[in-house]
């Protein structure tokens, strides 16, 4: 199993947020801005740039389906970059594959612009997506998404304890699940639990809910009822409708 502990992010490159854009509107924009504001205050002692919200609104305008990236670098003006997204990549039905990698202490709670560690891991593992483990083997998150497992009708996901990104999609998925009567526990997971799970899925700010079909060395899973229910609920929250019918 690969271990990545030498490529620490360069704080001077700043932090960023990526949001889904649907019908000219950035999805969950307030939650993304709140997370960015918290990172800027903690890391640099700076406030959210006053132009951040207007830059997002301008960038999202006219984009039917896409992603928007807002980057803030200390000492520079914030920048926005947008791109159209293939509809098949938003709430994808095709299952993804994971491959475990060790990152002692995890990636942390900030969305660093310096993604050398993640980019290196992704390049070495493609087509699989890195599943980040702590040094003791605790599963934490994906390189671009948060981890959920389903077992016996309930969900579990790693806690936001400083080792993982407090995902916007993660928070909304938990809300959707609990509103639907699905129990969700936020706690440390084990590799044995992951291997024994009935279903595994990831959540992310652009892809929404993404089923996991396989993890190297751990097992394979089918996309089942709980994944479908959370997916449909998040689709309705973000897009106003779901494709479950």
Predicted features by range, described:
Residues 1-58, 62-67, 71-245:
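Helix-start/capping segments and mature chain N-termini
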């Amino acid at each position: 199993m690969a271990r990545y502990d030498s490529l620490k992010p360069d704080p001077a490159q700043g932090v960023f947020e990526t949001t889904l854009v649907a019908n000219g509107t950035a999805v969950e924009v307030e939650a993304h801005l709140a997370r960015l504001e918290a990172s800027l205050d903690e890391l640099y002692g700076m406030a959210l740039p006053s132009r951040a919200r207007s830059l997002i609104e301008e960038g999202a305008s006219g984009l039917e389906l896409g992603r928007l990236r807002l980057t803030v670098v200390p000492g520079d003006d914030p920048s926005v970059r947008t791109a159209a997204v293939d509809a098949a990549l938003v709430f994808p039905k095709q299952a993804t594959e994971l491959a475990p990698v060790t990152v002692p202490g995890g990636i942390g709670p900030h969305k660093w612009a310096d993604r050398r560690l993640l980019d290196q891991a992704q390049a070495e593992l493609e087509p699989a997506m890195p599943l980040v483990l702590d040094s003791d083997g605790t599963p934490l998150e994906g390189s671009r998404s948060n981890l959920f497992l389903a077992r016996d009708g309930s969900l579990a996901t790693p806690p936001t304890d400083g080792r993982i990104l407090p995902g916007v999609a993660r928070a909304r998925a938990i809300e959707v699940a609990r509103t639907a009567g699905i129990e969700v526990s936020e706690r440390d997971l084990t590799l044995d639990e992951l291997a024994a799970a009935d279903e595994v899925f990831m959540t992310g700010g652009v892809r929404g809910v993404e089923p996991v079909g396989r993890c190297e060395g751990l097992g394979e899973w089918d996309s089942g009822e709980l994944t479908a229910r959370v997916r449909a609920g998040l689709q309705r929250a973000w897009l106003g409708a779901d494709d479950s019918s």
